[in-house]
C-alpha cells in the first residue's frame, strides 16, 4: 500500500490518530468459532450461548488486550468518547458505540432476497449461517497482531470455560449510545494503564504456556517506557506537543 501510494506522491499512515478532535483509524477484528465446518455463533435467529460466552471472555479481558491492540500513545487519543471509537466495556447488536459489536449476519433467512434479484432462477433453499461474527472494535493499526490474536484466543477460552461468563456478558449488553450508560467499566487511557491491566491478568495469559512470563514482563516494560500516563492532560495544554506526537507515530503498522 505504501509503495503504491508513494508512486502517486501520496503518504499513507496506519496511525490510530493524526488529527486530534476528529475520528481516528481503527483495525477491527471479526471473529467466529467453527466446529466441524459449522459456525457456532449462530443458530437460527440471534447469537448462541457459545457466542455470548466468547463475548464475555473478550469483555472480561478487554482492558488488558489493549496492551497488544493499542500499544502506542496515539492509540489512546483515538479511544475517546464521541469520536466513533469505543471507550466503555460493553457489547451490543449493530451498535457502533460499543466495544464488541454484533454486525448484521444472515440469520434465519431463506432465499427470498436471491429470488427477488434473480426471478428466473430456481429456489436455492435456506442460506448458510456461517457469516455471523462478533467484532472487537478497540484495536488499531499499531497493534501487534500476533500477540493480539493469541490474547483473543486466551480470552475466548476463558469465556467458554468459566461458567460466569454468560451472565457477565448479559450484564454488559447495551442498546443505544454506550456513553449514556453509567456504571460501565472503561478502557485504559494510556499505554501505562494498559500495561498495569496486563500485569493484573498475566496469570490468564500465561496459563497453559500461551504467553511466556518473560514476554509479559518485556511487553509491559516497553509500554511503561513510553511514559504516557498523563499524556491526555499534557496535550490539552500544548498544541506543539500534539503535532510532535502525531509526527513521531505517523509511520507505524
Model-assigned labels for residue ranges:
Residues 170-253:
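Acidic, glycine-enriched catalytic cores built around paired aspartates
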Residues 2-164:
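Active-site capping/gating regions of soluble enzymes
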Amino acid at each position: 500500500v505504501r509503495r503504491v501510494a508513494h508512486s502517486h506522491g501520496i503518504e499513507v499512515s496506519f496511525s490510530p490518530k493524526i488529527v486530534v478532535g476528529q475520528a481516528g483509524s481503527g483495525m477491527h477484528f471479526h471473529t467466529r468459532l467453527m466446529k466441524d465446518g459449522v459456525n457456532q455463533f449462530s443458530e437460527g435467529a440471534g447469537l448462541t450461548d457459545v457466542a455470548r460466552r466468547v463475548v464475555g471472555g473478550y469483555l472480561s479481558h478487554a482492558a488488558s488486550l489493549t496492551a497488544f491492540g493499542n500499544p502506542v500513545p496515539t492509540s489512546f487519543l483515538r479511544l475517546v468518547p464521541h469520536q466513533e471509537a469505543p471507550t466503555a466495556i460493553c457489547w451490543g447488536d449493530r451498535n457502533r458505540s460499543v466495544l464488541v459489536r454484533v454486525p448484521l449476519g444472515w440469520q434465519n433467512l431463506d432465499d427470498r432476497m436471491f429470488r427477488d434479484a434473480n426471478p428466473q432462477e430456481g429456489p436455492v433453499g435456506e442460506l448458510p449461517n456461517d457469516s455471523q461474527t462478533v467484532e472487537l472494535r478497540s484495536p488499531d493499526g499499531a497493534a501487534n497482531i500476533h500477540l493480539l490474536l493469541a490474547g483473543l484466543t486466551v480470552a475466548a477460552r476463558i469465556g467458554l470455560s468459566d461458567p460466569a461468563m454468560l451472565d457477565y456478558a448479559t450484564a454488559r449488553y447495551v442498546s443505544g449510545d454506550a456513553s449514556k450508560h453509567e456504571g460501565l467499566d472503561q478502557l485504559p487511557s494510556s499505554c501505562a494503564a494498559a500495561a498495569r491491566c496486563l500485569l493484573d491478568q498475566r496469570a490468564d495469559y500465561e496459563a497453559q504456556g500461551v504467553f511466556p512470563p518473560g514476554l509479559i514482563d518485556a511487553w509491559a516494560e516497553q509500554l511503561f517506557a513510553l511514559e504516557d500516563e498523563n499524556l491526555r492532560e499534557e496535550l490539552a495544554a500544548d498544541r506543539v506537543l500534539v503535532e510532535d506526537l502525531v509526527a513521531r507515530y505517523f509511520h507505524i503498522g
